[in-house]
Amino acid sequence: GIGGPDRPPHPETIETLCTESRKSDVHGYQPYIGLPELRRAFADWYNRWYNVTLDPQKEIQPLIGSKEGILHISLAFLNAGDGVLVPNPGYPTYSSVSRLAEAEIFTYDLDENNHWRPDFKQLESLPLDRIKLMWVNYPNMPTGAKASMELFTKLVDFGKRHNIIIVNDNPYSFIRNAEHPISIMEAEGAKDVALEMNSLSKGHSMAGWRVGVVVGKKEWIDSILTFKSNMDSGMFYPIQAAADTALALGEEWFKELNDIYYGREKQAYELLDALGCRYRKGQAGLFVWAELPEGY
């Protein structure tokens, strides 16, 4: 199923939306690149939670939900026949958008014995000279595997050695993730080879508001903006203002949210135990990934 949060956003976020919507001068078209205030809010947020420094004028592109970023990135960097690495299991949109871009899809397996992480030996056996881009998603959906700096460092090194753009889809880093959330952009040299998408859908309970972001070096953000500006428009001003409010929320918000999710996790474990399913504790994100018993 879809990982759709059922909790409302923070009351202050909703209040900002309502207050701004009542103003008479906020209902026109907005800049494709997003409001300067929102880009600054994303930069501050990345610095606060991930210890990553980003230039809000050059390295941040707000999105109408991070899902659209998959399309924009694919169209910006993939030509017909280019290879793209897609995880299995993984988010189906990576493959469907790659087909729209007429790219050649190479799947790479995520295996429980390897902690649901890429097998770099398997990757090295692929025709990497034909591959332009690699989709990764950590914390992972649907397996719940958490991110690590060791993994991100390996991915950055892999991308550099083979001239492959690494794109980390990172909407789950604040959900059932007791450790400090991390970003691939923390890895040394990541800006040379990586992009990262993030979202307010999960960690801020704003799935229907459609607020996301892609971050990376200026040249790549400019390329993405070129495609985006020909496909959609800027977000509604009050939504951008409310997103600014949401991005300023502190640890208390995430603790309250995760207390609810951890309570549901406990109930899910009890149900899975009753059914005889096998699962691993300590997963992140909105899912519990489990193996059905024999006979089902």
Give the positions of each predicted feature.
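Conserved PLP-anchoring active-site segment centered on the Schiff-base-forming lysine
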Residues: 76-98
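Conserved glycine-rich beta-strand-loop-beta hairpin in the small C-terminal domain of fold type I
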Residues: 244, 259-272, 279-292
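Structural signature of PLP-dependent enzymes
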Residues: 224-231, 246-270
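Helix C-cap/helix->beta junction micro-motif
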Residues: 101, 161-162, 275
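N-terminal small-domain helix-loop-helix segment of the aminotransferase-like
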Residues: 1-65, 72, 247-249
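Active-site phosphate-binding strand-loop segment of PLP-dependent enzymes
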Residues: 110-182
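Active-site PLP attachment segment
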Residues: 180, 186-223, 235
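Short acidic capping loops at alpha-helix termini that bridge into adjacent secondary structure
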Residues: 53-60, 80-83, 130, 191-194
